[in-house]
Amino acid sequence: MTEQATTTDELAFTRPYGEQEKQILTAEAVEFLTELVTHFTPQRNKLLAARIQQQQDIDNGTLPDFISETASIRDADWKIRGIPADLEDRRVEITGPVERKMVINALNANVKVFMADFEDSLAPDWNKVIDGQINLRDAVNGTISYTNEAGKIYQLKPNPAVLICRVRGLHLPEKHVTWRGEAIPGSLFDFALYFFHNYQALLAKGSGPYFYLPKTQSWQEAAWWSEVFSYAEDRFNLPRGTIKATLLIETLPAVFQMDEILHALRDHIVGLNCGRWDYIFSYIKTLKNYPDRVLPDRQAVTMDKPFLNAYSRLLIKTCHKRGAFAMGGMAAFIPSKDEEHNNQVLNKVKADKSLEANNGHDGTWIAHPGLADTAMAVFNDILGSRKNQLEVMREQDAPITADQLLAPCDGERTEEGMRANIRVAVQYIEAWISGNGCVPIYGLMEDAATAEISRTSIWQWIHHQKTLSNGKPVTKALFRQMLGEEMKVIASELGEERFSQGRFDDAARLMEQITTSDELIDFLTLPGYRLLA
């Protein structure tokens, strides 16, 4: 075991190789990763620069819109390459981080697909990222098991769910591996290692290397992924279209480019997904300079609001026209041990999923196995003997306009809502910088999107000098006062021992910095990553 940085070609690894690393960072795997990093990092950096330029244009008054130059793609008659047999039925998908016990429980749940997450529900500390790759390799090979401290053994049942791997977004670095002195893209690290170690075993059992792509903002980013996938297929002599991806439409710029995104990735894409929580965060962030587009309390921004309903319907219409799946969004509720409260939770999930299924979505997301039966029953009811709803074209819909997609929604900004935002965001940030990205808070399974909505909402209320429903103006001073008060509430709710052992001071400091800074910080996970091992 060496202490100095290990260099292979042009990649430098800042961590020593332990037993876990040796299993994943084999010479052949690192050679493939090196090729991807050297081929594709320069263009990825240009794509990130283009994001900054686009945001500056929006800040200066140019609202997002459909692209006139690509009208021919939108108007032409074309379809994606196709959907593999084991992805034709995705009526319920469960998501969760790539932790060993969670991987087993998710694959065993009453669902069709498990999205194993290296992104928003995993705090990417080095050991967790490496262990995650080991866990997925063992899951693909069918050998994964886990024994807890009490001696309970977890292992896979026959016919587990289909596995899809969500890689990190384009903006996230993997700081423990550098190329030319810079941290490499986390997305390429996650993709290269999962693909390299698993494509043969996946194909041998009639599945394939399937991916979820997060936080895309443009068709050019989708085209970049298409080139990455095609390179990997050619490198290992695989037919074009072996790698399949589902792409999350969870940024405001991307909703105006869904046809173009599907077209750019047409050999590899099988569907789009309504990443609704990140989409709300992106709406706030993208339109941060517009005082007439400030959102109310997070709790008031529901899928029946016009701008979100338009987004859901346009996604379904666009996907089905092109032969691609239109996946619904996340139900983040956690089942309750109290029967009456649990019935309320399940009724909310049922209503939410019924709206999606009736709109024409092909499937939906849950964050907890205890919701699987409820979500499954809703989609079974609507689907009947069908595997999906690809034939639901929504041709009766009037064309959805940019104005509808950008329309702000009504609702109050309340003191109670602002205080709840503070408590949720601080608790989430504390968990994330402690290495846990998937956190139960007040009956919801929260990931980074929730904290992002919370802190950007308050930033925007301060920035535009909004008032709360009780007449109090939202200022930095009011926020700081509430932050101090809510820290005491968190301490009393969690108990002194948990509070004092945690990293709540660090979390509050980061929350204060990103909420009161003059410029809105792009993603809290970027400064958060500096506080992670």
Curated annotation (Swiss-Prot):
EC class of the enzyme, as a word: transferase
Reaction(s) the record says it catalyses: glyoxylate + acetyl-CoA + H2O = (S)-malate + CoA + H(+)
Keywords carried by this UniProt record: Cytoplasm, Glyoxylate bypass, Transferase, Tricarboxylic acid cycle
Keyword Transferase carried by entry: yes
Gene Ontology biological-process entries: glyoxylate cycle; tricarboxylic acid cycle
Biological source species: Escherichia coli (strain K12)
InterPro entries on file: Malate_synth_C_sf, Malate_synth_sf, Malate_synthA, Malate_synthase_CS, Malate_synthase_TIM, MS_C, MS_N, MS_N_TIM-barrel_dom
Gene Ontology CC terms, in alphabetical order: cytoplasm
Gene name for this UniProt entry: aceB
UniProt family annotation: Belongs to the malate synthase family.
Cell compartment(s), UniProt: Cytoplasm
Pathway(s) per entry: Carbohydrate metabolism; glyoxylate cycle; (S)-malate from isocitrate: step 2/2
Active site, UniProt feature: R166 (proton acceptor), D447 (proton donor)
Pfam family, one: MS_TIM-barrel
Name this protein carries in UniProt: Malate synthase A
GO molecular function: malate synthase activity
NCBIfam families, alphabetized: malate_syn_A
Primary location recorded for the protein, binned into one broad class: cytoplasm
Enzyme Commission code(s) on record: 2.3.3.9
Presence of keyword Transferase: yes
